[in-house]
């Protein structure tokens, strides 16, 4: 029979849909398994094959676990709020809702063509009002807990995007979205108090089965530092607080430096220096954080005209303002120890400030005894503990743990996001909306551009913003900021547990059944964004008794990048691969322009993405699924090669022909069964270990050996087909029915492996003629002596031709010698 995936795959996809084959049930008598992909943002570009690596891996695990008797939750949804749809709306006037709907339809079609076994009934988008009603409700829960608040703060403002960005959305002074310049400005914002959970988030990492590099990224981002909070007296009513991890260097302090955003600068600055300080602050506000902290930047600063008293020496320490100090970590003030800190030394050299050595080459304290303060000779922690104890007695300092982590800047000046469900009143108070007022929908608008700095598009809709509040009978003003894209993805995994609940975001019963997520697969780029934010929300819910587990994701795997060849005209941009020409090892365009050829991450911008539908049309989804795994270990970068899909298609052709041939018989064949049992055992082990890249080659090795048999055991093939089903489900379903079984191969269960077949029963015989080695012969050790001698004669037939065998020497499991 001929293998035609175009017919087979559509047939079985329709069967699964009609029979709701992948519907997840909360079945008490079954163990559960929750396997989840980081759900995608439905962009206009659609999916390329690089996106399918992780999705294929989770689908293999989901199908395997169903076959093993688990109740499996394997859902898919859409992280559909976000900036690209809004930017498209600004350019075209098309409502983001319409763009998003169209993109989701395309994504759904692409995923369906791959045969992924999602529970379609649980699908939702974060932009569905039925979903973000609960996102708004959960935000209000955080507000009631004191974890959501408003404050004036220095923010990352991107003029090109027209919105404020969280620290996690800025890299090297540029927006991660689009790579636009970001500057610091003061703005009143909604903020989530993630720092209140810094220690819990840090400790919780220890028990997670996550890649160590992701855990380390979160540790570094949280940035726990143990040190001291020191107070430097400015006058009798005012102190400046400084956090330091090196209190042992206190006697080397010769100046203090404040961040330009520090709120107390205006109270400290002298009238003579006020104009210069204010000018410097304005200049600093126009710089990105990357510019300010650059190691190659010449240090700048301005003297405030004020001094602080050194806690030990009593010296007057000049107080400066410099943009190399960033507000938000520590207290926004640093103590200048130029002899032992490179940045401080550069600053001291720039402004001719004293440099006092207080540590020797072995880090022992020197030049640090003053009166009853005796620090000389002490080292490291002992020295720091002495300083802290001395200052604490005088109310000038204490031990302090600080975190690099900032509270999460939560509001955005955008349209396409969840409206924040708060009403503000003229007296400065505000009211959270009640349950019967949710969801709060955004108004329909024509102009999606921000109104100006600090005001999103919603601020322009006066009839929506300015209201008469029916609950209080007072005039009020709706909040015009929206939530960030991360809000909906902070808790979506919980909604999948109970996607149709209209009374609550999830029920306790369903949450207790499904949580935590057993396997979570997605990109490492979310290490300090989505993964940290969702852990924070989950910790809050856990403390409140809303969820049963302290952590949401038990095991995490980051799939590696998929690389593909890109072609670029230097200084101009990328060209499509079909426009590239090779001539004597050089690549050019059709017009002769020289090209740079690289192996880069597959992406739309580099024009090197591969549309999976093209490969499905040519080779079939099962072949594409097999190659997606065969291309390399799941967590490693891999180079995509379309020819590899062709090789997997050839294997499937061969397997289909073998399984549908007349040689398939209902017989008991020990050799065929042994091959099948060993394959099933190997495939099961590889799935459990997530060594999915070795599975295709195991099947190829199997068929090479199995095809040598004269007849093919139906029982052996039924095992192999069931083992193939997780990775190539369409052909497996088809062959399962061809072999005479009822449709629905997942329901047939995973084949039971008999340990007796796993023993190595092969024996290598040395075949000699007159004592000379002429051949080697692999035989099953249970083969009869007569059959072994027959096979041995055949293996050395050319040496026996026209000769009389005088004697046959047979040594069991070792040797056959023909004496002529």
From Swiss-Prot:
Residues holding ATP: 604
InterPro entries: aa-tRNA-synth_I_CS (IPR001412), aa-tRNA-synth_Ia (IPR002300), Leu-tRNA-ligase (IPR002302), Leu_tRNA-synth_edit (IPR025709), M/V/L/I-tRNA-synth_anticd-bd (IPR013155), Methionyl/Leucyl_tRNA_Synth (IPR015413), Rossmann-like_a/b/a_fold (IPR014729), tRNAsynth_Ia_anticodon-bd (IPR009080)
Family to which this protein belongs: Belongs to the class-I aminoacyl-tRNA synthetase family.
Protein name (record): Leucine--tRNA ligase
Keyword Aminoacyl-tRNA synthetase in record: yes
Source organism of the structure: Chlamydia abortus (strain DSM 27085 / S26/3) (Chlamydophila abortus)
Coiled-coil intervals, chain numbering: none
GO CC annotation terms, alphabetical: cytosol
One Gene Ontology biological process: leucyl-tRNA aminoacylation
EC code(s) of this entry: 6.1.1.4
Annotated motif 'KMSKS' region, positions: 601-605
Biological classification of the source: Bacteria, Pseudomonadati, Chlamydiota, Chlamydiia, Chlamydiales
Motif 'HIGH' region per record, residues: 40-51
EC class of the enzyme, as a word: ligase
Annotated catalysed reactions: tRNA(Leu) + L-leucine + ATP = L-leucyl-tRNA(Leu) + AMP + diphosphate
Superkingdom of origin organism: Bacteria
GO molecular function: aminoacyl-tRNA deacylase activity; ATP binding; leucine-tRNA ligase activity
Keywords annotated in UniProt: Aminoacyl-tRNA synthetase, ATP-binding, Cytoplasm, Ligase, Nucleotide-binding, Protein biosynthesis
